[in-house]
């Protein structure tokens, strides 16, 4: 695909919080309340054409056309799993690609896993995304637009920042994207419905807790520094003792726990000794452990644990009073499971643009219906 076309240099309003959009419009000499109107068109009705904003004057619409634009993401391709999981491939304006995953849940609910970077710098050896390195950060608009695109396929009840990239390596843009997700004039999600996963960037974890409310998940995957250093290079900079201290200091709201993701890898971190060390490591932390059997992929020589080993590991944690859940790995047949995203699909093109536009929901009739 030729991506050499001139870039649109107008300001993308999808990168603005309500406060920033208010100031932008005030700088144009417009009333401050207009920002809320524009926001609601962009996010409640998923409109990206100023001419469709019927409660704005023709003069304002014309001025906005000249100075601003509203970006969108349309899937270049989609791939559907036998279990109902859908993977989206998005091509960004500079030609780079990212993936998002829509995961079906019980009661016709859905969780959306979104990306925060093109590639990833963390280099976790079990993760396919990390094998490509970091290309660039996503903008707030590129993060939020993944949700807007998925809403065209139906409600999204929960959002997890667990796709391509390390969210805390793109902290400023991620915080702004979360603010847009939470705003009543934006996508109006409750922070209770949004979870951010980190490999363990300790200073950014501390900053995150001060700046925005979000459920925290920590990709742990080992109980000793020796093993975690090998699996996750970030541990050489922020070893387990520092990571656990940051977790104990993270501001938790009532009834909330920090989720610790533990990818169980055969003969690497799945022993009885690992289970015992994990109980000790998380002592005193309001914790929930998600046990994730390793999802095998071509870029790794690691193997999945046996069913017997998974049950034994989980059983030990449960017997010692921990909340330990085996997480089902959905979308494995389309490489959409944990650690398998790579920003490339080889599938037939999606439905025609007109069909997708006609399926777009009008979210103006009441707010928060996707929660």
Curated annotation (Swiss-Prot):
Bias type Basic and acidic residues, positions: 353-365
UniProt GO BP: rRNA base methylation; tRNA methylation
Family of this protein: Belongs to the radical SAM superfamily. RlmN family.
Compartments where located: Cytoplasm
Lineage: Bacteria, Pseudomonadati, Thermodesulfobacteriota, Desulfuromonadia, Desulfuromonadales
Keywords, sorted A to Z: 4Fe-4S, Cytoplasm, Disulfide bond, Iron, Iron-sulfur, Metal-binding, Methyltransferase, rRNA processing, S-adenosyl-L-methionine, Transferase, tRNA processing
The protein, known as: Dual-specificity RNA methyltransferase RlmN
SUPFAM superfamilies in the cross-refs: Radical SAM enzymes
Region span, Disordered: 345-371
Cofactor(s), by name: [4Fe-4S] cluster
Reaction catalysed by this enzyme: adenosine(2503) in 23S rRNA + 2 reduced [2Fe-2S]-[ferredoxin] + 2 S-adenosyl-L-methionine = 2-methyladenosine(2503) in 23S rRNA + 5'-deoxyadenosine + L-methionine + 2 oxidized [2Fe-2S]-[ferredoxin] + S-adenosyl-L-homocysteine; adenosine(37) in tRNA + 2 reduced [2Fe-2S]-[ferredoxin] + 2 S-adenosyl-L-methionine = 2-methyladenosine(37) in tRNA + 5'-deoxyadenosine + L-methionine + 2 oxidized [2Fe-2S]-[ferredoxin] + S-adenosyl-L-homocysteine
Binding site for S-adenosyl-L-methionine: 165-166, 197, 219-221, 295
Gene3D superfamilies, alphabetized: 1.10.150.530, Aldolase class I (3.20.20.70)
Active-site residues per Swiss-Prot or TrEMBL entry: 99 (proton acceptor), 338 (s-methylcysteine intermediate)
Gene of this entry: rlmN
């Amino acid at each position: 695909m030729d991506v050499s076309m001139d870039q649109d240099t107008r300001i993308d309003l999808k990168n603005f919080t309500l406060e920033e959009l208010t100031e932008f419009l005030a700088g144009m000499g417009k009333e401050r309340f207009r920002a809320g109107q524009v926001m609601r068109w962009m996010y409640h009705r998923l409109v990206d054409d100023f001419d469709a904003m019927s409660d704005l004057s023709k003069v304002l619409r014309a001025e906005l056309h000249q100075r601003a634009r509203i970006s969108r993401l349309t899937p270049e391709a989609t791939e559907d799993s036998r279990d109902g999981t859908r993977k989206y491939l998005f091509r960004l304006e500079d030609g780079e690609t990212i993936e998002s995953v829509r995961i079906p849940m019980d009661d016709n609910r859905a969780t959306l896993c979104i990306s925060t970077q093109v590639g990833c710098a963390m280099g976790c050896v079990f993760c396919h995304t990390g094998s490509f390195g970091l290309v660039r950060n996503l903008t707030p608009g590129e993060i939020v637009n993944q949700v807007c695109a998925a809403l065209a396929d139906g409600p999204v009840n929960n959002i997890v920042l667990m796709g391509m990239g390390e969210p805390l390596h793109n902290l400023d843009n991620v915080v702004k994207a979360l603010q847009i997700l939470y705003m009543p004039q934006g996508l109006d999600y409750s922070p209770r419905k949004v979870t951010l996963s980190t490999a363990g960037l300790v200073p950014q974890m501390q900053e995150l807790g001060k700046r925005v409310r979000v459920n925290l998940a920590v990709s742990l995957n080992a109980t000793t520094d020796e093993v975690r250093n090998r699996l996750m290079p970030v541990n050489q900079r922020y070893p387990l003792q520092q990571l656990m201290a940051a977790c104990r200091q993270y501001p938790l709201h009532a009834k909330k726990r920090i989720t610790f993701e533990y990818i169980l890898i055969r003969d690497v971190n799945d022993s009885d000794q690992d289970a015992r060390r994990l109980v000790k490591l998380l002592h005193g932390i309001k914790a929930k452990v998600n046990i994730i059997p390793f999802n095998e992929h071509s870029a790794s020589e690691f193997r999945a644990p046996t069913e017997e080993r998974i049950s034994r590991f989980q059983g030990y944690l449960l017997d010692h009073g921990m909340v330990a859940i085996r997480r089902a790995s959905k979308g494995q047949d389309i490489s959409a499971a944990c650690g398998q995203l790579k920003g490339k699909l080889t599938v037939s093109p999606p439905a025609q643009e007109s069909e997708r536009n006609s399926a777009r929901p009008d979210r103006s009739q009441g707010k928060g219906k996707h929660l």
